[in-house]
Amino acid sequence: MSQIYTSAEQLIGHTPLMELCRTEQQNHLAARLLVKLECFNPGGSVKDRVALSMLDDAEERGILKPGATVIEPTSGNTGIGLAAVAGARGYRVIIVMPDSMSMERQKLMRGYGAELVLTPGAKGMTGAVEKANELQQSIPGSFVAGQFDNPANALAHYRTTGPELWADTDGKIDAFVAGIGTGGTVTGTGRYLKEQNPAIRVIAVEPAASPLLSQGKAGPHGLQGIGANCVPKVLDTGVYDEISPVTEEQAYAAARSLARTEGLLVGISAGAALHAALELAKRPDSAGNTIVALLPDTGERYLSTPLFD
């Protein structure tokens, strides 16, 4: 039977779930270690789901009108997703991003036709959010998607990511591991999975150099895509059972190992989630468990960073 898609939006979601068999063997794991490969979304990251959900919600509620300008503060991937989806729908797109993010992310957004406004990296996402709000005040009829505050962010994962994981594992999942940037992935996916089975453990990953959730301290770090140095409104802190701090070196090492062991090139935050999942899988009490880590994006957008040096 033929299967022909008529828009890139139809390609979002239903990403593959893969067992890391070689990694399991090398580390003598007694647990199954699975990864959700979000780089298979058309925009190359998990944030395609969020972009689509926020735009659909805004259009349905009548707050996003034809010909309007979509503005978004983002560390990169949401900007790429919005640039692709909103641009294809005919909206003007302005992305506000810290200048510390990779050049690949900047070029990708421009490639999709978005306008890019850079803010000082030292101010993190807080600086980008402030600038986006300034732009909204100066551009009539503009819409700030607001992924850090927008319930449609977490809803995307509640409606898609969670159900996909539950179906693909046939309900046999013991732990879910994901990094926290906006908190949408952990909140939406975690809620859905715990509704199916309250015993499922949700592990939140944050930068060790900015342990805001675990220790109340924020600071600069090198884990692009997570650790926004604020507690987003989207994040439900009651969903996760444990916080796993990961260093930049640990994230890099995990991503490099995955490329050379499994042939999968993933990004920095994916390396962080993988490291946390691997450490969980090594615990004696994880024997026989199925652990799933969500890997947000492809490593190709980090080739200008030291990730694969």
Task: Identify the residue ranges that each predicted region occupies.
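PLP-dependent amino-acid enzyme catalytic core
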Residues: 1-309
